[in-house]
Every structure is written in C-alpha cells, then in structure tokens.
Regions:
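Single conserved hydrophobic/aromatic residue that forms the stacking wall/gate
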Residues: 2-13
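Feature captures the catalytic cores and cofactor-binding loops of soluble hydro-lyases/lyases
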Residues: 11-301
Length: 301
C-alpha cells in the first residue's frame, strides 16, 4: 500500500485490493467457454446480483419505484429464471455451467491484476483470467518493437519464437495516444503454440475481448523514458502473476543480480533520447502533449 501511496497511486492499490478475493462466477468468452448470449439465458445480471446479494445494498431505490431487493424477489416469484433456463436445456446445459453459485466460484482472485517491478515501477495491467496457466510464471527473452506495425509483422512472419516476450512500446498516452494492440494480441492468441509460450508487454492498451498472455498499461511509458524504453534485444523479462510482479532479471540472455540490472539500465538511460512526437497537428498532438500515464487514467492535465 505504501508503495502506491508514495507515488500518488492510491487508486491502483484500491483496485488491487478489491480484485484479490473477488469471486469470479461467469463462464463466457473470452475468459470462459460459452458465447456471451448464454449469460442472458442463465439469468443475466439479475442472476449475478442474486448470487452476490449478501454484499449488495438491497434497500436502495431503483427506477422501477421498488428497491433492488424487491426487484430481485419479483423476478424470482415470476419464474424469470426458469423461463431463461429453457434455452440452455437445448444445449444440455444448466445455469450453473454459465453462472456459478457464489460459494462455487471459478476463482476467487478477480479477473485483473496490477503488476509492478523494475519494468513497471508505477504498474502494469493484466487480465489474468485469459492467461494460460503455464504463463503465470515465466522468464522470457525480450523482442522490443517501437510500434505495433513492426511487432505484428514479426509475429505473422514467424520471426517471434516460443520463449519470446514481444515488447511494443511508444504506444502509451504520450507516445501515440494509446491505441489498442488488438491485432497483435489476436495473432498471438490464435496461434496455439505462441499463445502458451510467449507474452505481449506494452505501454499501449487492450480491448475487453482480448485474450492470451497480454500485459498492458506499462507505466511509466516509453515516451517519457520509462524502463520499457530501455529494454534491448535478448534481455530477460520475468512475469510472476501470483506475486504481481513484472521485472527485468537479465541482460543479453543472462540472468544477473537486481543491482546489476539497475546499473545497466542507468547506463542506457544516460544515452536515451525521447522520440519526436509523431503527430504534428490536430487532436492527437494536443492529447499526447497533455496526457498523464496510463496507470493514472491517461486523462489530459
């Protein structure tokens, strides 16, 4: 907590705390097995609220003129859930296959994790529910790219190999306006071998439908000289989702002590020069000049 508070990142700590212990009940894509419409036929949002009502304020008034608790009770008494379940029967499914009871959750660690370490001193974000278990703890060899176009070309032409960490940088709020790294994540996740053996690490962002071992929002971003800007080919990147860490643990393919890594990064930082803004006019030029880091929300100051 003190780590985040000392950097003015109390909200990051709050998100981390809320996710740890949060029950994960829903088995729909991309993190789960079934299409999103099955969520509706399993009872949808009301069913989720029914499962978690012990932590809800059931006495709050709603637009129906009734309290939340009264609305949920009405749905139950009107046979809403039984009507929904008939569609699932056609697929030989039960409601519990889509929405688990609270005490039988798929997981109890939420769906989002904030990682930090010497690669992301302010933090980075991973949707761990879509990451293959074998990638929860991994040490990978860095393949840095200064834009998504170069990275996806390398993936599609098979220049990226199992055991690599694809680093896409200068795509954060100040770097390029923080576009979505959708094409690269899909190219990796759709390859059975790469999806379970490499990771994508970026100061850019992802969509809610992304899947696979993708870590985004790395802060500070490359455009302001964050550690992600200093990574070179072959550096070793360690991911440890259970420990919530993301660190550079080796240089040029060889693991070394943290103090040695810090010394090398300090040398590289002394030689680093910021890139010119790729936008010369318009809204994106204004945004990139005034945006704060992604971990703080990427808003304009």
């Amino acid at each position: 907590r003190d780590y985040y508070a000392s950097r003015g990142l109390g909200d990051v700590y709050k998100r981390q705390r809320l996710h740890r212990g949060a029950h994960y009940l829903l088995n729909v894509r991309p993190a789960g097995e079934w299409p999103a419409q099955f969520f509706y036929y399993a009872g949808g949002v009301p069913r989720i609220m029914e499962e978690i009502k012990s932590v809800l304020h059931l006495d709050v008034m709603t637009v129906t003129g009734k309290t939340l608790g009264e609305n949920l009770e009405d749905l139950k008494n009107n046979g809403y859930y039984e009507k929904c379940g008939r569609y699932l029967e056609k697929w030989n499914l039960k409601r519990e296959d889509i929405i688990r009871p609270f005490d039988q959750a798929f997981g109890t660690d939420g769906s989002i994790a904030i990682l930090h370490g010497n690669l992301a001193p302010e933090g980075a974000v991973v949707k761990h529910t879509v990451v293959p278990r074998e990638m929860f703890q991994a040490t990978l060899k860095a393949r840095p790219f200064d834009c998504e176009e170069d990275a996806i070309h390398a993936v599609l032409t098979h220049e990226v190999k199992p055991g690599d960490a694809v680093i896409i940088r200068y795509e954060g709020p100040k770097g390029s306006g923080m576009p979505e790294m959708f094409y690269t994540t899909e190219a990796i996740a759709s390859d059975p071998e790469l999806g379970a053996s490499i990771a994508l690490i970026t100061d850019g962002r992802f969509s809610g439908a992304s899947k696979g071992p993708a870590i985004g929002h790395v802060s500070p971003e490359a455009a302001v000289g964050g550690p992600i800007a200093l990574i070179e080919e072959g550096d070793l990147i360690q991911i440890n989702i259970p420990e919530r860490s993301l660190s550079i643990v080796g240089i040029a393919g060889r693991e070394i002590e943290p103090a040695g890594v810090d010394a090398v990064l300090a040398e590289r930082r002394a030689a680093w020069k910021p890139k010119a803004n790729r936008y010369t006019s318009g809204t994106l030029k204004f945004f990139t000049e005034h945006a704060v880091s992604a971990i703080q929300g990427g808003y304009m100051e």
